[in-house]
Amino acid sequence: MDYNELRETYKEFIYKSYNIEETEEKIRVTYKFEIVGLSEFTPYWEFPKKSGMGQIAENNALFETMVFSLGMVELVSYWKITCAPLVRVQAGALNEAQIAWWKELYFHGLGEFYYTNGIEVKQDDFMEMVSEGNAPTGSYLIKENLKGCMVPIGGGKDSAVTLSLLKEQKDSNYCYIINPRGATLNTVKSGGYNQDKMIAVKRTLDKRMIELNQQGFLNGHTPFSAIVAFSATIAAYMNDLKYIVLSNESSANESTVAGSTVNHQYSKSFKFEKDFHTYEETYIKSGTYYFSMLRPLSEFQIAKQFATCSEYHDIFRSCNVGSKEDIWCGHCPKCLFVFFILSPFLSQERLTEIFGADMMNDITMLDTMKQLIGLSPEKPFECVGSRDEINTAICLTIEKLEAQGKELPELLEYYKSEGLYEQNKGREQYYFTYYDKEHLLPEEFDKIVKEKCYQ
């Protein structure tokens, strides 16, 4: 369906309300959104309560502010169905600076959505937002003496590396999972954490949204890591935890489309991390502290670190295609990227065991390789490392295999025959010693990264 026609037909989107139901076992939050003239949507979240927590939400303006804010990021999944030009926020109150903050998140967080749907928009006119609600009444129940870490677990190598770096703090660590699945649960287990140390929340999508997507309404990527940030703040507050420890690396800052600001990983970027940190400190004030443990590192360094974490090698999963079946599909850009980035540090035989496919010998992946290494203007719309890092990993693997007297796999043979090895070799020292100073790590965590990753 045409973007302009949809905006003309469905001119208003309303964030109507949120409802909080609390029992001894959980807190359930139900949101109500409406595309005027098309449909209402009522997605919900469930946050588990540990025994003895007592009443949390009742008459707690801080908790309501967190819930309202999660709704603000949740709404974009429903707004994008028609991209209504007017958004009316009736569920709470926002000032002009907050409205500008949310619009910036939506605009950049939907960069891939606009690009893949062929939509050209400008930040100053893609949406008008008006605040029509009131701030919550009740006490602003700030918790003192928050301590410990909560690590969001995605099931891939990055959160496994964060857990391994925080091994000595294990007694005060918790793992945070949205909608548990095989790889996330296995990561928690392999890290040596039991059920008591896992905070598993449930997020639902309204079925009506899926129906409308199937009917041809607009669909595409939304800033999921922003959902993680706002929901994790609620979970950390409920469990008296100070630090929300993400696993986003420096390479997440690179744009997906060369020469543009379109970034599949925008809400994993340092810009979003800083922006969220400022927003939370200014408007929510939960007392939690959100930062990425791996921000100083490149994907290359993370892969080197992960290669030493053998307890996770058979259970980690990053493949979106195979995520529902908890497998590596062995044919997508994400699988090929992870295969390449680990190839200097693990043998080809071991990688073939892990992925169930010898991907470097699969010539049908040649076009995907070209995207990953920068021979195409766009990187795949996946969470993958920078083009230079992937080239460096391939060069190191070629060096390793030739030193061992082994025949090069087909993709690496092509790479070398095209002169790419000569063009890109010799950069590894830069990535082995790379340290991005743009990060928010508290000193004690920065010290851990420096001690364990720069030897």
Regions found by a protein language model. Name each.
Residues 1-148, 165-178, 182-206, 217, ...:
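RNA-binding accessory domains that recognize and position tRNA/RNA substrates
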